Amino acid sequence: MTKEEKQKTLDELNSLQPLYRNAANAINTIFTTFGKLRQQKFSLWGDHTSLSTSFVPLILKEFPEAKFIFLVRDPRDVVLSYSKIEGHPAQEPIKSAKKWKNSIQTYKWLKEKHPEKVMYLRYEDLVTNTEIQLKEICSFIGMSQADLFPTPNEHEKVRDRLGTE
């Protein structure tokens, strides 16, 4: 994020009326302002970090329409990938195992309490059956594939970004 983007985002946050100064509006303002600054068109935004699994009850309180996609990858592949990144937290197996366990517990809790708000997706399935999995994701979040991929074969670009052929 550039200095100008940070300032614009702070200006937008400061412009929120006191009545609307809450976590949900602050987060929404940050995501939408950043998206607009990058000239991106979107109707949904999301967070792809595992950190958000620690805040699921708060997220549901602030964003009652929130949905969660748990993208799970074979742990052996995760360890192999992250072992190549010097200083990455995944190089500490006990910490990584605790984070993974917390994420799985959160998934199970969501599946039990709010089954309509959670989707389980294996990374390997996304890589090998990209088009099918993207259709399922679109269905889950309530978007058509045409909205998500406005040009033909756009899903192939997703597969390319996943590092597959």
Where are these regions (language model features)?
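The conserved 3'-phosphoadenosine-5'-phosphosulfate
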Residues: 112-165
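A glycine- and Lys/Arg-enriched "phosphate-lid" helix/loop adjacent to the NTP-binding pocket
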Residues: 69, 77-101, 160
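Conserved phosphate-donor/acceptor-positioning beta-strand/loop module used by diverse small-molecule
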Residues: 48-49, 58-83
